[in-house]
Amino acid sequence: MKLIIATFNIQNKYKLKEYSGIDSYGDHTKELVDFINDNNIDIIGIQELTSNYKKRLLKLINKKYKIVGKYRFTRFFNIFPYTKKYNETNSIITHKKIIKTKTYHLPFFPKTPRIATITYLLLENNIIRVINTHLENRVKKIRDKQLEYIVKLLEKDSISTILIGDFNTTIKDEQFNIFIEKLKKINYKRIDMNNQTHKINKLPIDHIFIPKSWKVNHIESPDLKCKISDHKPIIVEVTI
């Protein structure tokens, strides 16, 4: 069977008092929904989704899609303006049958909490796992620990897994290459896409990993010609 998979950091516009997917450039929630529909996406990992953005997304998106994943701060922290503004989820959006979902906290101290959302899906008679994450952007030592933690998550279960997210690092990073090699040893491969996905970095910091046995039919990182994010999405069609 074929699957269309995507990852997209939709950018929390934190300079606004509250971000619901709308700013002076337009309605980015609607643009995100159009992107999902126009590309017939089966599974997409979204990073930096705020609660107000998610509320509007749930209203606009086709009801066949489900949005799963908890926020990085508990409800208690929502009483504070700072943590409420930065309370994001790494959601997984899919129209496939969801079996279960769990959100894990990655090593993060003393920086802002980082999470990984894990969802098990039923595809015809097969169960697969999807992991969506967003790693530390400033402190390399913390990001390296997060990479190690993700390897452990993958090793915990032999089920075929899609790993997607904003890793905040490129293939020029030695530790990230060690991570790639570790994943190769447990039969995963990085989608070989080296186009720019962030306006500052010339190489992609957003990545998709899939089982080695899956065939890659098509890869793209489209320029959406809108101000939805400072990232570009990655889309890949695979055959399982």
Regions of interest found by a model, annotated:
Residues 43, 47-127, 222-225:
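Structured beta-strand-rich core segments of catalytic domains in phosphoester-bond hydrolases
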Residues 1-60, 79, 148, 240:
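N-terminal, active-site-proximal structural segment of metallo-dependent hydrolase catalytic domains
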Residues 66-95, 112-113, 168-233:
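Active site of divalent-metal-dependent phosphoester/diester hydrolases
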Residues 118-123, 127-131, 141-182:
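His/acidic metal-ligating clusters that form di-metal
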